[in-house]
Each structure stands twice: as C-alpha cells, then as structure tokens.
Curated annotation (Swiss-Prot):
GO terms for molecular function: large ribosomal subunit rRNA binding; structural constituent of ribosome. HAMAP family: Ribosomal_uL14 (MF_01367). It comes from Daucus carota. Pfam families: Ribosomal_L14. It is found in: Plastid, Chloroplast. This is Large ribosomal subunit protein uL14c. GO terms for biological process: translation. The gene is rpl14. Part of the 50S ribosomal subunit. The keyword RNA-binding applies. Its main location: plastid.
Length: 122
C-alpha cells in the first residue's frame, strides 16, 4: 500500500532513482494506492546528466509493492520493494528499459508498453 510521503524505487532507466508519492490519482479521498495505480510523485534522487532532475514532479505507475496482492485464483504475490515506472500524460513510459519483475495486472489496465518492456511478468 502506497500513501503520500512513501518513498519508491524507480524500475526504469528514465534517470530518476527514487520517488516520493505526493498524491494518488483517482478519487479525491483515496488513502492507499496499489499495483497499477497512477500517482503523482516528486523525484528525490536522480542520475546526473539525465532528462529528469531532482525535485521534478512526475506521474508514475506502481509496478511492485511490499503489500500482498491477492488474485482471484487464490495466489498471493508479494515483492521485496515498492517500485514505480515514470510515465507521461498518455501512459507511456519515459524510459526505454524496465528493471525487475512486474505483475500481470498491468496488462489488464492498458499499460501494455510497460508489460512488453519488462523482463519478467508474474
């Protein structure tokens, strides 16, 4: 579960290394975000000489959470870290590579470009 002020790792090569969640896109009073939700975040740590700089406000989609994700068939998926992928206004990733495994639920939420770039889909 991701809430405002949560720090997330960045799972792509967009230039950001760490994000802090500011807001959850959706209903005005949503408290937590889960895998597949879009958030507004600020870049807390970035790679030098890259397009994205520190303290820049971006949109990101959550691809991994430490909180368990329960599927309809009873399977429970849990990751070791909280991670997100930086996206643009259309939902396309800003980076060209995705690092680490991502959940299959992103395909159903029309993030097919992120799923196609991922090395492993669970």
């Amino acid at each position: 579960m991701i809430q405002p002020q949560t720090l997330l790792n960045v799972a792509d090569n967009s230039g950001a290394r760490e994000l802090m969640c500011i807001r959850i896109i959706g209903a005005s009073n949503r408290r937590y975000a889960h895998i597949g939700d879009v958030i507004v975040a600020v870049i807390k740590e970035a790679v030098p000489n890259m397009p994205l700089a520190r303290s820049e406000v971006v949109r990101a989609v959550i691809v991994r959470t430490c909180k368990e994700l329960k599927r309809d068939n009873g399977m429970i998926i849990r990751y070791d870290d909280n991670a997100a992928v930086v996206i643009d206004q259309e939902g396309n990733p800003k980076g060209t590579r995705i690092f680490g495994a991502i959940a299959r639920e992103l395909r159903q939420l029309n993030f097919t470009k992120i799923v196609s770039l991922a090395p492993e889909v669970l």
